[in-house]
């Protein structure tokens, strides 16, 4: 005899697994979005830095440009802290759902180091 209807337990278990997947997806997506923002800011800082070096060719960078570059670095470091928090939330979420191995998370979602501000001479 073939069973056609699911039991209440089976239905609840399926719903529970779907909810787990949604929660993990949401936490991972937040981390990925924050990392993307961080990458864009990092690339912008690097481009700005090299453009200024090329334009000034060894001369001192104008203070307003240096101020702008340091503001970009502040923004980068702020987003980096957000990334660290999202990473932490993902790990905590995984732990709460019974997932204990996180080595692939560490490999996939590497957080770049904090950037230091520049002084007068680049």
Per-range role (PLM):
Residues 36, 40-43, 47, 88, ...:
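Generic surface-pattern signal
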Residues 41-76:
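Mixed-charge, low-complexity intrinsically disordered segments
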Residues 59, 73-122:
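Amphipathic alpha-helical packing elements
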Residues 15, 19-23, 71-82:
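Conserved aromatic-histidine-acidic binding/catalytic patches
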Residues 1-16:
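Short, charge-rich amphipathic alpha-helices with coiled-coil/heptad character
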Residues 12-36:
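Short, charge/polar-rich alpha-helical segments
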Residues 8, 34, 62-65, 93:
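Terminal low-complexity, poorly structured segments
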Residues 31, 40-44, 93:
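Intrinsic-disorder/low-complexity detector
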């Amino acid at each position: 005899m073939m069973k056609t209807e699911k039991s209440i337990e089976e239905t609840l278990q399926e719903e529970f697994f779907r909810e787990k997947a949604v929660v993990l997806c949401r936490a991972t997506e937040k981390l990925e979005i924050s990392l993307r923002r961080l990458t864009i800011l990092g690339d912008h800082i690097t481009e700005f830095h090299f453009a200024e070096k090329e334009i000034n060719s060894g001369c001192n960078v104008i203070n307003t440009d240096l101020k702008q570059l340091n503001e970009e670095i502040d923004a980068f470091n702020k987003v980096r802290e957000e990334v660290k928090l999202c990473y932490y939330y993902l790990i905590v979420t995984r732990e709460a759902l019974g997932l204990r191995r996180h080595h692939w998370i560490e490999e996939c979602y590497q957080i770049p180091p904090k950037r230091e501000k520049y002084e007068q001479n680049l």
